[in-house]
Amino acid sequence: DHFQYGLGEIHISLNLDYLQINLLSEHHCPDSLQNLWILEKGGFDLDYVLECISYYKYTNYNKKLREKYLIRADKGIERLTYIIKDLDMITRLEAGDLSLNIETFDIIKLIESVFDLLEMKAAAKKIALSFDIDYKNPVLVKGDKERLQQVVSNLVVNSIKYGDINGTTEVSVENLIKNKVIVRITDNGEGIEKKHIPRLFERFYRVDKSGSRKEGGSGLGLAIVKHIIEAHNEKIIIQSELGKGSQFSFTLQKSEEIDS
């Protein structure tokens, strides 16, 4: 696979016979070091993958051992791919290079589709995904449907990631003012200390200073959410209490009818 982003390029080749990672920089050594720094900052343990590759080279005589280290390296590369794609998106968002495809759609159906996609992930932690009420009628909004699905998905994933076993993630959609609705995603998980809240939308910022990797992710999800919402000229708000849970809310423009 081949990925390109602001600081240079990364080429990844992987099969049962060889694994190769090449970091190519437009400005040679300094930017190459910067590339590695960004990946480490994102919680990606490059040393771990390189160690797996190194062991792989010396295990030609043992097929099972080779496969073990190949699987480990493959997981690291999968995470690296995730980070690179998110870096590319956030760079484009910050530069204003990502155009929005504005259309009218039913936000309730969009949320339902996110629930369907994340049902198994939530079930693994016995977390219930639900609406606050039974929405019998569509709630029409205007925006980039694909990008806003990413917003809802990132926020629901976040609530699952930091939710408690047997917890809940509840979504509500309410009228705010005449031409606005507010979408609230509320969980009863571990919550966030107030001192961390102002920095949650920063790239790679983690409340857990150990940079826990067991939950995966790129560390860019909330930064992407903020940029997408702001690209729509809308607002996102966080309310949280440590030990009680969190609520992420964002506004959207209402629409009266489906685009013809």
State each model region's role.
Residues 75-80:
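Short alpha-helical segment of the dimerization/phosphotransfer core of two-component systems
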